[in-house]
From Swiss-Prot:
Belongs to the Casparian strip membrane proteins (CASP) family. Residues 53-84, 133-164 are extracellular. It is found in: Cell membrane. The keyword Disulfide bond does not apply. It comes from Selaginella moellendorffii (Spikemoss). This is CASP-like protein 2U5. It is a multi-pass membrane protein. InterPro entries: CASP/CASPL, CASP_dom. Residues 1-31, 106-111, 186-203 are cytoplasmic. Its main location: membrane.
Amino acid sequence: MSEHRIPVAADKQISPPISAGEQKGCKGLKRTDLMLRFAAFVCCAVTMVVLITDKQTSAIQVPGFNNLTITKTVSFDLAKAFVYLVSAAGIGAGYTLLVLVLSIISAERSKAIAWFIFVFDQLITYVLLAAAAASTEVAYMGAHAPPEASWLKVCSLFGRFCHQLGASLVTSFISTVLFAFSAAISAYYLFSNTNVRPAYSKG
């Protein structure tokens, strides 16, 4: 009597279930990620608002003429680097808000979304860093005016403008650091598990 063998389907790769400890760690990491992104959103928004509203008008005495003064107004569009920083901060704030919304409405993060967030986290981190560094260099030149650069010491004439500019530079560097940490977490989400489930798994 011939034996009939029942064909057995090839085993599919099934991810092992997440333990209670892993679930707790994933939830904690997700909470940390959301907090970092919210803080980055706030810092980017503050940077943008502080720079856009940074404007001062002062009366400047003309050298050699004691009784002659001119009125001069300075604002963030004084240098292209500051305009670049405003744009970078605005993009960073908008992107972070988008990721926060996606994180709240979606319990799981698909691989496509994980790749999108990973790539843009890296990109925006470097864009913010470049913008903050360029703006800091221009601000330094305006504050100290090296003789070889033939710059005017703007900060000696427009103190409030420079103080407000300095505050925006501080928040821009803070947002860069926050984005760097978020980028590290998004890399972990993507590469620690092929199914991209660590922080956004249900349960």
